[in-house]
Amino acid sequence: MRSKVTGAKRWVVKIGSALLTADGKGLDRGAMAVWVEQMVALREAGVELVLVSSGAVAAGMSQLGWTARPSAMNELQAAASIGQMRLVQAWESSFGEHGKHTAQILLTHDDLSDRKRYLNARSTLRTLVDLGVVPVINENDTVVTDEIRFGDNDTLAALVANLVEADLLVILTDRDGMFDADPRNNPEAQLIYEARADDPSLDAVAGGTGGALGRGGMQTKLRAARLAARSGAHTIIIGGRIERVLDRLKAGERLGTLLSPERGMLAARKQWLAGHLQTRGTLVLDAGAVQALRQANKSLLPVGVKTVQGSFRRGEMVVCVGPDGLEVARGLANYSALEAQKIIGQSSDAIESLLGYSAEPELVHRDNLVLV
């Protein structure tokens, strides 16, 4: 199983705030230098590398003399805008000492939910990687709002793994990996060395929240692994305080928790659909429609929908749930919520008489639908 790590040719490495700062007192340049040494060694071993770096808010807080992470959005954005300058300068300086170039890329969810911008970001990232440059990626905290934020850099790293079709996502954290119980409360807790990313039993052991400086707890890391699995990537959740951890991973040492995709890589468009985090409404399906989606790879027809919830326009993302309320799929609606209300439960042949026109016979076409 660890051959999936040692043989991986393209890595996305996510480093959290706690591993880049000196107890919240600004950037730890010494720690960053050690990370860079290991990443340069990976590059020289032929590994293509993308870095997703937290730390902008923490660096800005230190510069402003703040000791506690603010909750107000405008204060967070102010800290991020100050800290991002210092963060990128630190990475550029450290990589430059080894003759390596870096590039800053700031992303928002809007960048990846728009198909044209998504493809442009993918093209830019792949070009940088092909040139041997190390892209340093962060969320654009200065302009993002609660409604369109990724929520944490674990999720962003997973979507970047999809963008560049990475073989491996490495999420470095302040824990040694995922445990079968909370090691802070249970001394008998055992590290989970390998599992399938979609294993439902992992949800029960992934509770908890992030640290004081960061946003992502173990649950977000598990969700990130599942997102990355959509593009066929393996994910390692591993302790960033383990000495020379990246070197040791590359050497095949059995460290951290390796989460593997069960299914093969989704097609590129399906990866883009799976990466949509913001949904506008919900379609409640009957059992027959659920079966048609899951077993026959069919489009979603109006006749199979029982209820429409929320407000959405044509082309916006909706969640499809079964009679039990569990999510089955998500996709882009061919009709608005108001139009969908009028045609659900009806044959596609009746759409024109009900609406006065017929855009498509499907409520969600299978090409715009991804199973979850």
Swiss-Prot record:
Record domain PUA: where: 280-358
Gene Ontology biological-process entries: L-proline biosynthetic process
Keyword field: Amino-acid biosynthesis, ATP-binding, Cytoplasm, Kinase, Nucleotide-binding, Proline biosynthesis, Transferase
Nucleus found in the keyword field: no
Matching SUPFAM superfamilies: Carbamate kinase-like, PUA domain-like
Primary localisation category: cytoplasm
Tagged with keyword DNA-binding: no
Catalytic activity: L-glutamate + ATP = L-glutamyl 5-phosphate + ADP
Pathway this chain belongs to: Amino-acid biosynthesis; L-proline biosynthesis; L-glutamate 5-semialdehyde from L-glutamate: step 1/2
Listed InterPro entries: AceGlu_kinase-like_sf, Asp/Glu/Uridylate_kinase, G5K_ProB, Glu/AcGlu_kinase, Glu_5kinase, Glu_5kinase/COase_Synthase, Glutamate_5-kinase_CS, PUA
Cellular compartments annotated: Cytoplasm
Protein name: Glutamate 5-kinase
Organism whose genome encodes this protein: Pseudomonas putida (strain W619)
